[in-house]
Amino acid sequence: MSSMRAERVGEQMKKELMDIINNKVKDPRVGFITITDVVLTNDLSQAKVFLTVLGNDKEVENTFKALDKAKGFIKSELGSRMRLRIMPELMYEYDQSIEYGNKIERMIQDLHKQDR
């Protein structure tokens, strides 16, 4: 399997997952999330779903618990929307790149304030 196919399937999966999680998952523990990336293995057997959650650490933890509990539902919804022979195993990971970028931005702003 080419990695180009894995990238295309990952982009489509990202769109579908956002729709499923925002509109179909009814668990109140699921907070406001943004899926930043979906990385599939070349054989499309596993998908790492990178996401950010708006909220504190407790809300992040509750969101991941809710997504883990709804994994079967999400996978079946995804299967009905995407034409794949085997639906990949979903693994959720917290994406810290947004927080890291915000931290760098604050540091740069602080340096500019010190220069004035």
UniProtKB/Swiss-Prot annotation:
Monomer. Binds 30S ribosomal subunits, but not 50S ribosomal subunits or 70S ribosomes. It comes from the Bacteria. Signal peptide: none annotated. It is found in: Cytoplasm. Belongs to the RbfA family. One of its GO terms (cellular component) is cytosol. GO terms for biological process: maturation of SSU-rRNA; ribosome biogenesis. This is Ribosome-binding factor A. It holds the Pfam family RBFA. Keywords: Cytoplasm, Ribosome biogenesis. One of several proteins that assist in the late maturation steps of the functional core of the 30S ribosomal subunit. Associates with free 30S ribosomal subunits (but not with 30S subunits that are part of 70S ribosomes or polysomes). Required for efficient processing of 16S rRNA. May interact with the 5'-terminal helix region of 16S rRNA. NCBIfam families: rbfA (TIGR00082). Its main location: cytoplasm. The gene is rbfA. InterPro entries: KH_dom-like_a/b (IPR015946), RbfA (IPR000238), RbfA_dom_sf (IPR023799), Ribosome-bd_factorA_CS (IPR020053).
